A protein has these predicted regions:
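Histidine-rich, glycine-flanked metal-binding segment
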Residues: 73, 82, 86-128
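His/Asp/Glu-enriched, well-ordered alpha-helical/loop segment
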Residues: 143-145, 149-154, 287, 328, ...
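Polyanionic/metal-chelating signatures
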Residues: 166, 171-312, 439, 473
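Bacterial N-terminal signal peptides
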Residues: 52-64
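Boundary at the C-terminal end of the N-terminal hydrophobic targeting segment
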Residues: 68-72
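Active-site gating loops and adjacent loop-to-helix segments of metal-dependent hydrolytic enzymes
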Residues: 144-160, 201, 218-220, 268, ...
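C-terminal cap of metal-dependent C-N hydrolases
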Residues: 80-83, 419-463
Length: 474
């Protein structure tokens, strides 16, 4: 493979800034008391500080310029088997990427490669879309506290640590986009956030946004045993449903008051952050991602969704195979997890491999998720193989890792398949994606490499070893 044009990650630039700091620190004592009139006769300390700031800005400017230059150079990936998910696999195909998006793909000889393109020989490799996890907790669970069971004003991205090693392990597993959620210990634990694993060192750099710049995400809800405990939390399933009905009724009344006030600030009710989030749910602007296991709990979610008209994705659905027809009639998608190790809890005792196949046959849109740490993100790819073993078709198994999840997050126009105009998020494998022996070689997000198994530091997060599970400042 031709060595790719690698852009140093921000962590490296930070280390360079630190090196500048160290170097200047060592020479600081050599500076005269006054550096000269060019620095306006400032003191040695102030002059030194200004010099350090100037060096830092220069380095960061170069980093930005280099990154932009790399994204402008077309990249042509040739010779691989390309599985676009939307469309038939392409043997010995070519994938052309430029400015972070897919410009062309097709059989060898059918794609015009610009003379300026950087070429990557992927003969013998397999290229698939970037993997999408619809339910993850990496970066620190955070979310609601013990003050009450319903907390729609809580935003998970206010508590995420982007330097958490889970992000490095996720790209090592081929993941390129996530729905990061609060935990499930509440009836409603807060707002989720949809992120791209671009390698940014701030949460703002990871968040996906709409055309108006608003951060995208859903709303996390749960029922069953997780949210049942001492007051003020509910103690029964019936009380859980009653509390949520009351909250949605209040949100509907708040929405109606806002609508009646039009643009008159004097008529508007006092701003209520709790109810604002629920109004977004009622208006369909925020999808509910609902943790639920038992078949009766699943039916309760469908009942509430029908009553209040909110959009919902069912998560886990350990007993979803028992009510697959009911889920299909409600036209509600399911995000499932396949756990092949013992443990868990009693309400998930009927979780089986055949769930995906049964849901597919019933016509239910089905995706997989990790619920990381329940399943390590590095093992996400193998869920397709487990699902196919349990009865899913090969096509549905691959979609469950990619396009199905994108649809559940309303992101399928941007990600989830390899298609002209979509974001250049893809994974390079050394074999069949359904084989448990297949490894992720490289992960690319928006046309930039974010994981390379050939890099010793990346390999550490892919295969384990000393330091792999320790959160470190990159």
């Amino acid at each position: 493979m031709v060595a790719p044009l690698r852009i140093a990650p921000l962590g490296l630039w930070i280390r360079l800034v630190d090196a500048v700091d160290l170097s200047l620190g060592r020479t600081r004592g050599l500076l005269p008391a006054r550096v000269g009139p060019s620095l306006f006769g400032l003191s040695r300390g102030v002059s030194f500080l200004m010099l350090k700031i100037a060096c830092t800005l220069l380095i960061l400017t170069l980093a930005q310029w280099t990154s932009a230059l790399a994204q402008e150079v077309p990249h042509a990936f040739t010779g691989a088997k390309i599985i676009p998910v939307e469309g038939e696999p392409i043997e010995a195909g070519t994938l052309l990427v430029e400015a972070g998006v897919i410009k062309a793909l097709g059989p060898a000889g059918k794609v015009a490669i610009p003379a300026t393109a950087k070429r990557f020989d992927l003969k013998g490799k397999v290229v698939i879309p970037g993997l999408i996890c619809t339910h993850s907790h990496i970066g620190g669970i955070g979310g609601g506290d013990g003050s009450g069971p319903v907390q729609p004003d809580v935003r998970i991205y206010d508590s995420l640590n982007v330097r958490d090693s889970g992000f490095r392990r996720a790209v090592a597993g081929g993941l390129t986009a996530l729905n990061i959620m609060p935990g499930s210990g509440h009836l409603l634990s807060g707002q989720t956030v949809y992120v791209k694993l671009r390698g940014s060192k701030t949460i703002e750099g990871l968040c996906l946004r709409d055309k108006e710049g608003r951060i995208l995400g859903g709303m996390k809800m749960a029922n069953g045993t997780n949210s049942q405990r001492a007051a003020p939390f509910p103690g029964t399933r019936s009380k859980s449903a009653a509390l949520m009905r009351a909250e949605f009724i209040r949100a509907g009344e708040y929405r109606d008051k806002l609508a009646a006030a039009l643009d008159d600030p004097e008529k508007k009710p006092p701003r209520d952050l709790r109810l604002e989030g629920l109004v977004e749910v009622l208006e369909g602007r925020r999808v509910v991602h609902h943790h639920t296991h038992r078949h009766d709990d699943i039916m309760t979610v469908l009942r509430l969704s029908r009553e209040f008209g909110f959009r919902v994705v069912l998560h886990h659905v350990s007993e979803g195979w028992m009510v697959a027809e009911e889920i299909a009639r409600a036209k509600v998608p399911c995000s499932i997890i396949l756990v092949d190790s013992p443990g868990g809890k009693l309400e998930a005792v009927n979780l089986v491999f055949k769930t995906g196949g049964i849901l597919e046959k019933a016509g239910v849109l089905t995706a997989f998720h990790t619920d990381d740490w329940i399943t390590d993100s590095r093992l996400f790819l193998r869920m397709a193989g487990l699902g196919v073993r349990g009865g899913m078709s090969r096509e549905a198994g691959l979609k469950a890792l990619t396009l199905a999840g994108a649809k559940m997050l309303d992101l399928d126009k941007r990600i989830g398949s390899l298609k002209v105009g979509k974001d250049a998020d893809f994974v390079i494998l050394n074999g069949d994606p359904l084989s448990v022996y297949t490894k992720v070689l490289e992960t690319w997000v928006e046309g930039r490499k974010v994981f390379d198994r050939g890099d010793p530091d990346d390999l550490l997060h892919a295969a384990g070893g000393y330091g792999a599970g320790v959160d470190q400042d990159p």
